[in-house]
Amino acid sequence: MKNLIDIAGKVSSIKKIFLIFVFVLISGLTLQAEAPAIIIPEGLKPGDTIGLIAPANYKGTSADAEVEYLLSRGFNVVYGRSYDSRWYGFGGTDYIRAKDINDMFANKNIKAIFSIRGGYGTIRIVDKLDYDLIRKNPKIFSGFSDLTTLLLAINEKTGLVTFHGPMSSNFDKIPETTENGFNKAFTDKQSYNLLEFDDSYSIMKSGRGEGKITGGNLSLVVASLGTEYEINTDGKILFIEEVNEATYRVDRMLKQLKLAGKLKNIKGIILGDFKGAKRSELDDMSLEDVFIDNFGDMKIPIIKGFKSGHVRPFITVPIGANAKIDTYKNEIIIEKSVK
C-alpha cells in the first residue's frame, strides 16, 4: 500500500513538473510572437548624408534625377557597391547587395538609405541582413515594388518604421504631390494626413479604424507567406498596390491572403492605383468586381485609388507607423513617421 502511495505521489509530481514545463514553453512562444516596439527613425535635414543602393535589379537607366534632386535639397549622397555593380540582372552578387545594407546601417554618418530600383532580387538577400545591427542603428530605409520584401522584414524583425517611398524614376520632373509626401514622411516630425496630397482616391467602404500600417506591393506581400518574414496583419491597416497584373491574378492573390487569415482582423484597407490591371479574357472579373467580391462583406474602412507605388504622383507610406483612418473626415492620420 505504501508503495502505491509513493508511486501516486511521484506521478503527481511528474504531472506538476510537466504542467510547469508546458506553461513556460507556451509563455516563451507568446513572448517570441509579440511584435517588437515601434522604432521611429530620425528625420532628414539639410547636410545629412543619404546612401544609394541597388538591392534588387542593377541600376540600368540613369539615377541622375534622384541624385540631382537630393543634392538640390542640400543632402549629401554616397553610393553603395551595388549602385554600379552587376551580376546577372542584379545590382551585384547577393553578398554585395546584402553587405551594402548592413554597412550603411552600421555607418553613423549615413542618415537614410534609398533604393534606386526594384525589379527582382531582394528575396535572395532577406536572410542575409543583420537585423540586430539594424535595430541598434535605426535610420530611414526607403523603396517600393520588390523592396516590399525588405520593408516588411525589417519592420517585422526590428520594429523600425520603413518607407514605401519613391525611387529613381519618381524623381524625374518630380510632381508637387510626390515632393509634398516626401517632405512630410522624411522631414516633418508632426502627425499628418496621407490624404491631403491628392484627392483622386475614392471611398469604397466608410468607417473608422486604427492600427499600424503594413503592406506594399501585393505580389511581394503574398510571396512572404509561409516564410520567417511573413507579413503580420493582425490589428493593422493593410496597404496594397500592384501594376500590370491581370485581374484574375489580383483575385488569386487576394484569395490567398484571405485563406492565410491575413484579412481576418485588419482595421482598414488602403488600395493603391493597381495601374494596368486588365481582364485577360472577356469573362474575367473587372478590377472593381474583384474588390467587391473580396472585400464587400467587410465592415472596415476601405479607400481605393490611393497614389502610391507604380504611379505618378507617388505618396510615401510609412510601414509600421501608427495610423487612424476616418473616411467621414477624409483622413488617414499618420501619428509620426520620423522624430
Identify the function of each model-found stretch.
Residues 1-13:
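N-terminal secretory signal peptides that target proteins for export/translocation
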Residues 17-28:
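Bacterial N-terminal signal peptides
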Residues 33-109:
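ATP/NTP phosphate-donor binding region
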Residues 52, 113, 146, 221, ...:
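Buried hydrophobic positions in well-ordered alpha/beta secondary-structure cores of metabolic enzymes
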Residues 131-153, 161-168, 301:
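Short, acidic/small-residue loops that bind anionic groups at enzyme active sites
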Residues 160-220:
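Conserved anion/nucleotide-ligand pocket segment
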Residues 232-287:
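Internal helical hairpin/lid segments
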Residues 276-339:
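ATP/nucleoside-binding phosphotransfer catalytic cores, i.e., glycine-rich phosphate-binding loops
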